[in-house]
């Protein structure tokens, strides 16, 4: 029969992993529980077997299985969900399809629509080398990659050249930069565009004037009878030259690098466009004589011819002309090959046609050099017709020359055309890239685009997440303060545990934490297990939430619930020393050894009484006589009567006598009554047991099978105050708390009985009982355990019982339970117990004389469904020392699921 969740408890909810990273054991469990794993890449889910990813262990996905901590997982993936066994990668989902197929088939292919550089980046991210590409995709991948790298290199060079224009080392850098952009970058502003248009108009006007000056109708005759330029056209040309000169000088003055400016091809063209005009004026005005004038006139004619170079100034404003020039410069190999082929063909065919036509009358092929012209126009398929062969042999040579010319010219021309096309596209792309870069810079200056480093953005987002978590925690505390206690998830603290702690030989780590609050008579004994890998994480969470919800709702008085405020705690130290007393023979009571849970006083008292000892802690040898038992637990500072009630050890009920609180004193057991003498200031505070009616019948000797006497001990209590107040922390944290240590010594063996104490796990999971119970519950730890005889069994009376248990853990945290401790702890356990009742009709939870009933608090959460059959498997040969057995005390749902790879080890009990 499954347990029912308390009202308001959502059993499907798990611990929030938004702010608290999971334990390594939870990560390992999530990976081992399933053979498949979900890979979410860019929102596209893929499901693959773990063994498929193990084929490439050095890749990113291959390392995913070996990551068992939160930090290592975030180094491999971007996010993960352990409940869904899903890992998220914020990458290109299309490229991941090819990569995942490589894990499955061992064949790596690149999709047709993928960019080569993008696919290469994806391969680098997933840790796969590009050499694994198949031959069908490798050529295409490398070709596209080389092409893109070349374009990026050129773009980087262009941008570096433009960014290298620094004006910081010159005078008036801002003004010079603006002037340089105005003259060299027509697209930088509207004024620059207007200036470029005006410059183009001047170039066209100068070219037209140069052409019109050659018309005889417009020319003028001087005194020497020579034709000169028209005066009106000369004035137009002078204005154009003045504009060109001013433009050239402004470019030179505003240029960041003067030498680089002189070497520029466009600047050389500008200089050649204006230089002949000034040379002509200088030569004409300096030589007035007739003889000198005739010589100078020839030179001037040469410079006048150079004026036609002004048309090349249009290349500054034309991308096509710039592409043509750069294409010829980049295609010099192809051009050289073309010229070589033509030269060889001309030489061969001119020689052949000369020997074929030299014997003819009135032949025009008089020599081989004279035949070059025919071979050239024939190979280029021009054919002017001014010279041609007449003989049959000469015509055959002419036909072969035409075919050879077509083949020779046709081979390198396509290469030159492709270069021109590619360079033209590249020029256009670079112009757009420059415009885009300038637009982005303007947008950044205007604040339209915010540039941020990815690491800074991630750090900022993490800070916002922390703030959101803190705000959520504060709002939860203020809104649900009535239902919030120290077990609520809002008060959980994260404590990193090493893997060695969770996998050590210790099966359980006993921790104690006492909660004593203002206006509350409730005492909680919370324990934590350091081996959560034996149970399912989801069930641990469900049980933990169940305990959290059950305790506040089971309290009859809502005012007695926990408040967020906690008074400061102080430290008590109780030491236990042996007191030599006369040995007496203890009468052996003829009572039957209890081997069934039905004969115990309470199921809850039995299920919470098991102590765990490792194999190294069990020793048949008696411990040293001068042994000490230190019990540490936090208590509250006395301030009110309620604080005085809750100040003692766990499950220790002090008398309600008036008087000042004692700090130091001695706690002893009287022969008849169990009392606590606190004689720090002369006052005493008695501890009275509600189980005094059965003192004489229960003797420790009754359970001993030997005649070894039991030493009597005195009890001394030392209280030490610790003023520093510490907040209530969950049991899972490993931080030291203000504790109370107690040392007890037994003065009268007649008042000693045995109870099995077991910690209540903090998350509701109940570990399988496994303990070796000795006569006085032997618990050696680091030389601090008391001396006892051999490990024997106590027979329990059917009536009331008192107990003393020593528990030792690896963290030196001990527990103490005295008579009357369950007055406020346990009254009714039936609401949450779903197991079948004993057949004899008696309710073991209501056994007479078992506990006092001063508080109606429900402790049913300590019960589970198969609790009555827990000890029924104990054999009757419990008198044999060291007998071990398996104890299946709890519900089957506590154990690991059959599908889980984790194991749930059984515990051992020696009865």
From Swiss-Prot:
Inhibited by quinine at micromolar levels. Modestly sensitive to millimolar levels of tetraethylammonium (TEA) and 4-aminopyridine (4-AP). GO terms for molecular function: delayed rectifier potassium channel activity; potassium channel regulator activity; protein heterodimerization activity. SUPFAM superfamilies: POZ domain, Voltage-gated potassium channels. The modification Phosphoserine is found at residues 448, 608. Residues 523-534, 685-711, 851-860 have a biased composition (Polar residues). CDD domains: BTB_POZ_KCNB2. It catalyses: K(+)(in) = K(+)(out). It is a multi-pass membrane protein. The chain crosses the membrane at residues 191-212, 233-254, 266-284, 297-317, 333-354, 396-424. Voltage-gated potassium channel that mediates transmembrane potassium transport in excitable membranes, primarily in the brain and smooth muscle cells. Channels open or close in response to the voltage difference across the membrane, letting potassium ions pass in accordance with their electrochemical gradient. Homotetrameric channels mediate a delayed-rectifier voltage-dependent outward potassium current that display rapid activation and slow inactivation in response to membrane depolarization. This is Potassium voltage-gated channel subfamily B member 2.
């Amino acid at each position: 029969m499954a347990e029912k969740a308390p009202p308001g408890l959502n059993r499907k909810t798990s611990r929030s992993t938004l702010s608290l990273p999971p334990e390594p054991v939870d990560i390992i469990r999530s990976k081992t529980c399933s053979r498949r794993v979900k890979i979410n890449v860019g929102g596209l889910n893929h499901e693959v077997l773990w063994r498929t990813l193990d084929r490439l262990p050095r890749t990113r996905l291959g390392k995913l299985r070996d990551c068992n901590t939160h930090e290592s997982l975030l180094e491999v993936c971007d996010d993960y969900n352990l409940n869904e066994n899903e890992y998220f990668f914020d990458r290109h989902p299309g490229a991941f399809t090819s990569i995942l197929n490589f894990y499955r088939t061992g064949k790596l292919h690149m999709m047709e629509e993928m960019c080569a550089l993008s696919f290469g980046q994806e391969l680098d991210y997933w840790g796969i080398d590009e050499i694994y590409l198949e031959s069908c995709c490798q050529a295409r991948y490398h070709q596209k990659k080389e092409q893109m790298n070349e374009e990026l290199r050129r773009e980087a060079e262009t941008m570096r050249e433009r960014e290298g224009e620094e004006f910081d080392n010159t005078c008036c850098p801002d003004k010079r930069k603006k002037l340089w952009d105005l003259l060299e970058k027509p697209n930088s502003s509207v004024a620059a565009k207007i200036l470029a248009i005006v410059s183009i108009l001047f170039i066209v006007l100068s070219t037209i004037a140069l052409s019109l000056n050659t018309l005889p109708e417009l020319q003028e005759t001087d005194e020497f009878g020579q034709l000169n330029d028209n005066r009106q056209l000369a004035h137009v040309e002078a204005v154009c030259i003045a504009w060109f000169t001013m433009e050239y000088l402004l470019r030179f003055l505003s240029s960041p690098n003067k030498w680089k400016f002189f070497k520029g091809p466009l600047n050389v063209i500008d200089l050649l466009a204006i230089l002949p005009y000034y040379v002509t004026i200088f030569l004409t005005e300096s030589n007035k004589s007739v003889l000198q004038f005739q010589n100078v006139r020839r030179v001037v004619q040469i410079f006048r011819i150079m004026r036609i170079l002004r048309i090349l100034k249009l290349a500054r404003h034309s991308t096509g002309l710039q592409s043509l020039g750069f294409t010829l410069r980049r295609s010099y190999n192809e051009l050289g090959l073309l010229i070589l082929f033509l030269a060889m063909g001309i030489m061969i065919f001119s020689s052949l046609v000369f020997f074929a036509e030299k014997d003819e009358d009135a032949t025009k092929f008089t020599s081989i050099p004279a035949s070059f012209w025919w071979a050239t126009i024939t190979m280029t398929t021009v054919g002017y017709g001014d010279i041609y062969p007449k003989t049959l042999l000469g015509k055959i040579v002419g036909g072969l020359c035409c075919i050879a010319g077509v083949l020779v010219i046709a081979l390198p021309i396509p290469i030159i055309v492709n270069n021109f096309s590619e360079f033209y596209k590249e020029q256009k792309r670079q112009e757009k890239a420059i415009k885009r870069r300038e637009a982005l810079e303007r947008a950044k200056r205007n604040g339209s685009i915010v540039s941020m480093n990815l690491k800074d953005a991630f750090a900022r987002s993490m800070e916002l997440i922390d703030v959101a978590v803190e705000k959520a925690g504060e709002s939860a505390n203020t809104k649900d303060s009535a239902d919030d206690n120290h077990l609520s998830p809002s008060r959980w603290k994260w404590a990193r545990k090493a893997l060695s702690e969770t996998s050590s030989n210790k099966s359980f780590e006993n921790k104690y934490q006492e909660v004593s609050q203002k206006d509350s008579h409730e005492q909680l004994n919370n324990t934590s297990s350091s081996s959560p890998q034996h149970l399912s994480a989801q069930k641990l969470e469900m049980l933990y939430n169940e305990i959290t919800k059950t305790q506040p709702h089971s309290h009859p008085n809502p005012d007695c619930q926990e408040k967020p405020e906690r008074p400061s705690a102080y430290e008590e130290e109780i030491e236990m020393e042996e007191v030599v007393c006369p040995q007496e023979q203890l009468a052996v009571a003829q009572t039957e050894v209890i081997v069934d849970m039905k004969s115990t006083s309470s199921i809850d008292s039995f299920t919470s009484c098991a102590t765990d000892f490792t194999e190294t802690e069990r020793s048949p040898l008696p411990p040293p006589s001068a042994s000490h038992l230190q019990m540490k637990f936090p208590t509250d500072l006395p301030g009110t009567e309620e604080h005085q009630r809750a100040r003692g050890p766990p499950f220790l009920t002090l008398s309600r006598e008036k008087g000042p609180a004692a700090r130091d004193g001695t706690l002893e057991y009287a022969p008849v009554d169990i009392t606590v003498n606190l004689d720090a200031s002369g006052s005493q505070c008695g501890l009275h047991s509600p189980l005094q009616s059965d003192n004489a019948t229960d003797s420790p000797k009754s359970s001993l099978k030997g005649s070894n006497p039991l030493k009597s001990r005195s009890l001394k209590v030392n209280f030490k105050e610790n003023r520093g107040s510490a907040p209530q922390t969950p049991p899972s944290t490993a931080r030291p708390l203000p504790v109370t240590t107690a040392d007890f010594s037994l003065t009268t063996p007649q008042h000693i009985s045995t109870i099995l104490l077991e910690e209540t796990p903090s998350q509701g999971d109940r570990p399988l009982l496994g303990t070796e119970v000795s006569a006085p519950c032997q618990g050696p730890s680091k030389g601090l355990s008391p001396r006892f005889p051999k490990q024997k069994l106590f027979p329990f009376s059917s009536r009331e019982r008192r107990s003393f248990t020593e528990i030792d853990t690896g963290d030196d945290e001990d527990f103490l339970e005295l008579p009357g401790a369950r007055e406020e702890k346990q009254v009714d356990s039936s609401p949450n117990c779903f197991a079948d009742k004993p057949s004899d009709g008696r309710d073991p939870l209501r056994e007479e004389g078992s506990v006092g009933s001063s508080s109606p608090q429900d402790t049913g959460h300590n019960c589970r469904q198969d609790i009555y059959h827990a000890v029924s498997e104990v054999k009757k040969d419990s008198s044999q020392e060291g007998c071990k057995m398996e104890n299946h005390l709890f519900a089957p749902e506590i154990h690991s699921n059959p599908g889980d790879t984790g194991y749930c080890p059984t515990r051992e009990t020696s009865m």
